[in-house]
Structure formats: C-alpha cells, structure tokens
Amino acid sequence: MEKQLLDVLVELNGVWLSRSGLLHGIRNFEITTKHIHIETDCGARFTVRNSRSSRSARSLRHNKYRKPCKRCRPADEQIDRFVKKTFKEKRQTVSVFSSPKKHVPKKPKVAVIKSFSISTPSPKEASVSNSIPTPSISVVKDEVKVPEVKYTPSQIERLKTLMSPDDKIPIQDELPEFKVLEKELIQRRRDDLKKMYEEDREDRLGKLERDITEFFVDRGFLEIKSPIMIPFEYIERMGIDKDDHLNKQIFRVDESMCLRPMLAPCLYNYLRKLDKVLPDPIRIFEIGPCYRKESDGSSHLEEFTMVNFCQMGSGCTRENMEALIDEFLEHLGIEYEIEADNCMVYGDTIDIMHGDLELSSAVVGPIPLDREWGVNKPWMGAGFGLERLLKVRHNYTNIRRASRSELYYNGINTNL
C-alpha cells in the first residue's frame, strides 16, 4: 500500500509532532507546491517538505510521543486519535479469478551481509565459560539461518572501513573467514579507485565546492576568501564568553589569535565595508575550512568545510530565505525539512534537517548582535557543512569518509 504524503497524515492525525517529541494541536496548515506550512495552537510555526519519506511523515505514522505541549493542551480525543490511529481505513478484500500458475522451482535463498554489530555474552553465560568473550558479527539475512562466525573487534572495524554503502556480500551456508571477506572487499575498493581514476579524477569535496561556487556566483553573490586565523576578540564579539561550551572548542594559536570556528565574523566585516560601495542588496558568500574541538561521532569533525551565504538590504525576508535554500538543496538533490529552533549566538533560527541530521541553521536579521559589527540593515543568511552534504548525498555511515583525510578518498578506504 502506497505511503501517504505528509499533508494527508497531518489532516488524518489532527496533531503535529515536533522534533523534540511534543504533541501539538493544529490551528491551521497550508500546502504550497513542495511544502506544508503548519501553525500550531500555541502559535509555533513549522515549514516542512511535503514528502512521504521525511522524518515528520514517519513520526506521524507511528503513535509515540514524549508529552503533549503545555501551551497547546491537545484534547484527550486528539491524543487518543493519534495513539490508536482510529482513522485508518480497513483494507478491502477483492477476490480475483485467474488461471492456475505454473509451478516454478524456487531458487535457493542467499543471505546478504548488510551490517555489523558487536555482541558479547551475558554475565550468566560468561560465568559458565572461562574463555574470554569474543565479539561476533550479526548478519541481516533473508529467511536463511546462518551459523554465527566470530570476528575480533579489530577485524570488525577493518571490515566496516572497507565496506561501501552499496556492498552486499552473498553467502550460501556460513559467513566466510575474515581473510576471505577482507580480500574480496579490498579487491572491490581497488576496482572502485581504478574506475574513479579512469572516469572522473575529481575529489568529491573539491567538486562540491566548485559546484556551490558556480551556483552562488550565477545568482549574483560575490565570493569572499577571509583569513583562517582570526583575532580571539572576534569570538567575544560574537557573544561567546569563557563559560560557553563553544569557547572550549576553539583552537587557540596564542593569547590573541585562534583558528576560526565559524565564517560569520569576517562576513560581518565585509557586509559593513561593502555597504559603502556596492548597490542594494549586497550578496556575498564564502567557502572554507573551520576548526572546532568537536566530540567524536559520526556527524562531527574537528576540521570541516563551511559555506556561508548572506544578503543585506532589500528582500531579506523569511520567504526569500527559504526559497533560496530550497533552490540550493534542490540543485544538490538533497531532501530536507525546515524546523524552528533557537541558538545561543543568533537567537531564533530556521533549522534545515535531513532526517535527524542538521544540515544548516538560517537566520533572518536584524538581531541584537548586529550592533557589535556596525551592521544596521536587514539581512538574511545560512551556513551549511559540506561534509554533511556529502554524507547525505552518498549515504555514508560516518562523516569521516567525506572529510579531508588520508584514510579515505571519496569515501573509499585507502589502506588496501
């Protein structure tokens, strides 16, 4: 049965589930060409892509929520409707007469390795055996019971780094020995690298930078290249004091200089200076590396590449900001949702989400911070992490595959 679009799910449920798990009553919603604009009973506004496969659509198909919104106070009937899904229509049963089908012998089913996970014995099991518990690989398979083959943690990590998002390893009776599987994956990655060398020869991160540059230059934006080392004073002027968590993530060069953790400070300076020269509106953008002492994870890097684009003067509205973001992500072929949020530096922001991954935070000014930089006109701007865009486009499980790295080239492990 075909999945319903988000607007149908909103109408059927009669409630909205925010990213934080709050259940809201719906005051009104409107549908445009690609988006649905929702206003809740508490006055919150959400703009999301009208998609069947978005995070919002998936959440409305289920019946779990964290708690009702205290300001909306949805009625018990609304909550009951969402939880029990009483609106679902029963499927009709249709009898069809047809000629008997010819018997075709079934082919033996083949299991496919799709993912790895480490499992260890329970304390009770561990007490029975004196041997050291060995991690094992769990196999996602299609109705075939396969004996579990045990690999060491280092072997599992090695296989993970060698596998690509599209890898499927067919097996008949049991998992192959580690050396056999490793050899097969190494040969695949060597073939992938040879194919890239013969057909493309472009680094994906560099290619994305060039593609984004062309996109914004064609739309009248001036490209900026600002210093990577900036005065630490810029950080303080962004409202980040010594008690803020971002302050602890900054790479300091000496007492007065640091590696930039963001592009915004220098873009603020450019807006102020160019306002004396360029016609209204002023449009600028920059692509470049930033540095933060980020925690380890599948979505964070200490060295990452940002694109920030902003416009100052006339036409700086939320509608124009969302339209530009929509055009940009459609150009890159990336689906997204828009959600309202709040951050320490800019206050109210427009978050651009792909599933649970934040791609960007956009802001429509003026905001109180502008006074610190001598900017006194309306503006709008957004920033995207290029490695996150690549992670989404190529379905990488770990963002390091998209980063500046010696370990990976275009997502392929180079230790072959």
From Swiss-Prot:
Alphabetical UniProt keywords: Aminoacyl-tRNA synthetase, ATP-binding, Cytoplasm, Ligase, Nucleotide-binding, Protein biosynthesis
A cellular component annotation (GO) from this entry: cytoplasm
A single GO molecular function term of this UniProt record: tRNA binding
GO terms for biological process, alphabetical: tRNA aminoacylation for protein translation
Pfam families: tRNA-synt_2d (PF01409)
Keyword Iron-sulfur in record: no
Annotated catalysed reactions: tRNA(Pyl) + L-pyrrolysine + ATP = L-pyrrolysyl-tRNA(Pyl) + AMP + diphosphate
Gene3D superfamilies cross-referenced by the UniProt entry: Bira Bifunctional Protein, Domain 2, Helix hairpin bin
Function: Catalyzes the attachment of pyrrolysine to tRNA(Pyl). Pyrrolysine is a lysine derivative encoded by the termination codon UAG.
Family: Belongs to the class-II aminoacyl-tRNA synthetase family.
UniProt protein name: Pyrrolysine--tRNA ligase
